[in-house]
Design a protein with these regions (language model features):
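C-terminal helical cap and adjacent loop that interface with cofactors, partners, or active-site loops
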Residues: 22-42, 46-50, 55-56, 78-79, ...
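A structured beta-alpha segment of the ubiquitous adenosine-cofactor-binding alpha/beta core
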Residues: 118-137
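Bacterial N-terminal signal peptides
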Residues: 8-16
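Beta-strand-loop-alpha-helix segment that lines the small-molecule cofactor/substrate pocket
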Residues: 138, 144-145, 149-197, 211
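Glycine-rich phosphate/pyrophosphate-binding beta-alpha loops
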Residues: 326-337
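Bacterial N-terminal signal peptides that target proteins for export
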Residues: 1-7
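Predominantly a Rossmann-like dinucleotide-binding segment in NAD(P)-dependent oxidoreductases
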Residues: 185-190, 195-306
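N-terminal Rossmann-like dinucleotide-binding module
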Residues: 19-113
Length: 510
């Protein structure tokens, strides 16, 4: 009997029938094709349609004035409208929300800035009429998650540039459609990832780009934010909607559904699709406890299935052998935390929960800062005096330009204003945007890829290549800048336009 069992096991191992998954192509509920290959889930990268070209480094003709239409004026949209009234050379042409009164309410920001009223659109499909206008250059989307894609698709199909709040796409199908629409129409499709513009992240990115940490080989990011005070405030579609759109989405979907705050800044530091690419991930989550309780509390019914775990962890390995860890937790009580940690061969940076840098004396000197203590080492964070000197030396040029005004205008401490200002700056100067459609797709696809991993025993899953082989075309992530002369010229035109627009509106109201 033992001999028979051993023979059977040997045959199984020889032919792989006991351990190998079927290699037939499978399709999940979102339409994604995938198959097993040596224990790894391989996700198909579709071929680029004929006549379509990459938009890496896409630069469009300069826009003296950026004419904007805003769609989605609930929690985040009004703040964006307000911020744009502070940016010279912009014109808020149209406002749109499902609920008309929300759009009308945002007229107050224009009035306070002495700017003319904007056209108002509302209803389920109001954004379609906005996108058809021929006097809009940019559609700024801040709706609930499920409307990000349809609004962006409509805008791109109507020849508009788009900027989309996070997460900008909810699955791979949407990611690929946005990539193809951007490439086909030669228009910008930017993810509005504000955390890439926070002070620590920008200064640390500048340090990394100047070799302060040596080669960055590992990075961490997260979105850990107990949303208990906010669940009741998310938009609800009618009286029958007891959960609100965000809790409902978490209930129905597994994976890191809000990865971009953590992933975006570290992806820039690791030069993703600028010399490296994310290749493989493995995801794991805890069971849902708080999520189920929230459904029971808000819907007054027992929740038997809550797909999103209370805490999700995703591990990613890149083509160049770097590792990224991303976490998501909006359920349990703990301090706000985006982690943001870079581990380099010669130094270390960490934002949450303790902010600081760790370098030894030799590396600090090599980075252009003279240590004040003789025995400085990397076993702990550097003293405050050295920290201040290091940050001062490597203060990011974008922070020097916009930092002080950003603190006055606000928006998550000012980073939202910096993000919007850079978007307008690049459009006015005909430059590539700081984040392109490939960033959008790479950062947003973690949700579905993580779901694939966890639904298949936490298996390894390959990333599709949204650049379709061009991830190594550019070496190193960089922000684009105009020359001083070009910058001064575009700013003069912007200020002149805004001044005349306000004067015309004041005269009209007299």
């Amino acid at each position: 009997m033992k001999i028979t069992n051993f023979l059977a096991l040997g045959i199984c191992l020889l032919f792989g029938s006991c351990t190998m998954q079927k290699s037939t192509v499978q399709v999940n509920d979102k339409g994604t094709e995938w198959e097993w290959n040596k224990g790894t889930i391989v996700v198909k990268t579709p071929e680029r349609p004929a006549g379509q070209e990459s938009v890496i480094g896409l630069a469009l003709p300069k826009m003296e004035v950026v004419r904007v239409g805003f769609v989605g004026l609930g929690m985040r949209g009004p703040g964006a409208v307000s911020r744009f009234t502070y940016i010279p050379g912009t014109q808020i042409v149209a406002l749109c929300d499902y609920e008309k009164e929300r759009a009308e309410k945002c007229q107050k920001y224009l009035k306070e800035a002495s700017l003319p009223k904007a056209a108002v659109y509302s209803g389920e499909k109001g954004y379609e009429e906005l996108c058809k206008r021929d006097d809009i250059d940019l559609v700024y989307i801040a709706t609930d998650w499920l409307h990000h894609f349809p609004v962006a698709k409509c805008a791109l199909e109507n020849g508009k540039n788009v900027a989309i709040e996070v997460p900008s796409a909810m699955n791979l199908k949407e990611c690929w459609e946005l990539v193809d629409l951007s490439e086909k129409n030669r228009k910008h499709c930017m993810i509005l990832e504000n955390c890439c513009y926070d002070w620590f992240e920008m200064n640390t990115l500048n340090m990394a780009q100047h070799g302060v940490f040596g080669e960055v080989i590992r990075a961490q990011g997260a979105y850990i934010h107990n949303l208990a005070p906010f669940w009741k405030h998310y938009w609800k579609k009618g009286e029958d909607d007891k959960l609100g759109w965000r809790l409902d989405y978490n209930m129905r979907h597994r994976g890191d559904v809000y990865a971009t705050h953590g992933l975006g800044p570290v992806a820039q530091a690791l030069n993703i699709h600028r010399g490296d690419r994310m290749e493989t991930l493995v995801a794991m989550d805890t069971k849902s406890v708080v999520g189920k309780d929230l459904v029971k509390e808000n819907a007054d019914s027992v929740c038997n299935s809550f797909r999103n775990g209370d805490h999700t962890t995703t591990l990613i390995r890149t083509a160049n052998g770097k590792v990224i860890e991303i976490q998501h937790n909006v359920m349990t009580p703990q301090p706000y935390n985006r982690l943001y940690q870079l581990t380099g061969t010669k130094g270390f940076a960490n934002k949450y929960p303790t902010q600081g840098y760790a370098l030894d004396a030799e590396q600090l000197k090599a980075s252009g800062v003279q240590p004040k203590v003789d025995d400085l080492n990397s076993h702990g964070f550097m003293p405050r005096e050295e920290l201040v000197a290091l940050v001062e030396k490597y203060q990011h040029p974008i922070l020097k330009k916009y930092g002080e005004m950003a603190k006055e205008v606000g928006g998550h401490g000012g980073m939202d204003f910096i993000m919007d200002s850079r978007l307008v700056y690049c459009l006015q100067n005909g430059l590539p945007l700081d984040m392109d459609v490939y960033d959008l797709a790479e950062w947003c696809c973690l949700a579905e890829l993580g779901e694939l991993s966890m639904d298949n025993g936490c298996a390894a899953v390959t990333f599709p290549d949204f650049t379709r082989g061009e991830w190594n075309k550019i070496q190193g992530y960089k922000h684009a800048y105009a020359t001083q002369e070009e910058e001064a010229n575009s700013m003069e035109k912007a200020k002149t336009f805004t001044k005349k627009l306000k004067e015309k509106n004041r005269n009209k109201l007299r």
